Amino acid sequence: MGEEFPTISLLGIDFNLSNILMITVTCVIVLLIAIICTRNLQRRPTGKQNFIEWIMDFVRGIINSNMDWKTGGRFHVLGITLLMFIFVANMLGLPFQIAINDEVWWRSPTADPIVTLTLAIMVLGLTHYYGIKMRGFKHYFVGTYFSPMKFLFPLKLVEEFANTLTLGLRLYGNIFAGEVLLTIIATQLAHMNIFVGVLAIIPALLWQGFSIFIGAIQAYIFTMLTMVYMSHKVSDEH
């Protein structure tokens, strides 16, 4: 789309200030949600406590569908954090996009492949870390890359690379495409007369609602695949 972003150079490395801002905003929102929803907890949950407990149970279900709770319980907080972080990040760029001096400052951080691929690398790195920690290096390496047959080793390496790419690029592609279409619709509305523009708002709102659905689905898929990959690394039966 030919967008430009504010950058700052530090030690010869360029940092995207828009990404830094939006990731920080996402973290603050998720933290506030967690704090607000866990204050004044009661035995009989209502309202906000119901919401956070529903998220906890939802992630628990994702984990239980991939590994036993004794093994997967330690990843419960990771799953909750990923689900909430990615969902909030996906939503930030939907209502509007802010550009100052032709530089985009406000948009979904997950609409940048650098952010999503970094997140994917971090997640896959954690699966290797816990695999080695829980199974031992030798057992982990042999069980992961030489099972069930040794000649599959090259394919297993390709699979690791492909998993990282698909995990990151799937999230990026869906969120970026949604923002592009919303931008196109908004641009077209700006050039229409008032009567046609009012009618055109309807499909714009429908697409915005669909984008919210896609953002939620992508947060779920990313969290689900994280637990799938984690189960493959930490469970002996895989």
From Swiss-Prot:
GO terms for cellular component: plasma membrane; proton-transporting ATP synthase complex. The keyword Transmembrane helix applies. The keyword Transmembrane helix applies. InterPro entries: ATP_syn_F0_a_bact/chloroplast (IPR045082), ATP_synth_F0_asu (IPR000568), ATP_synth_F0_asu_AS (IPR023011), F0_ATP_A_sf (IPR035908). Keywords: ATP synthesis, Cell membrane, CF(0), Hydrogen ion transport, Ion transport, Membrane, Transmembrane, Transmembrane helix, Transport. One of its GO terms (molecular function) is proton-transporting ATP synthase activity, rotational mechanism. The chain crosses the membrane at residues 17-37, 80-100, 112-132, 194-214. It is found in: Cell membrane. One of its GO terms (biological process) is proton motive force-driven plasma membrane ATP synthesis. It is a multi-pass membrane protein. NCBIfam families: ATP_synt_6_or_A, PRK05815.1-4. F-type ATPases have 2 components, CF(1) - the catalytic core - and CF(0) - the membrane proton channel. CF(1) has five subunits: alpha(3), beta(3), gamma(1), delta(1), epsilon(1). CF(0) has three main subunits: a(1), b(2) and c(9-12). The alpha and beta chains form an alternating ring which encloses part of the gamma chain. CF(1) is attached to CF(0) by a central stalk formed by the gamma and epsilon chains, while a peripheral stalk is formed by the delta and b chains. Belongs to the ATPase A chain family. Key component of the proton channel; it plays a direct role in the translocation of protons across the membrane. This is ATP synthase subunit a.
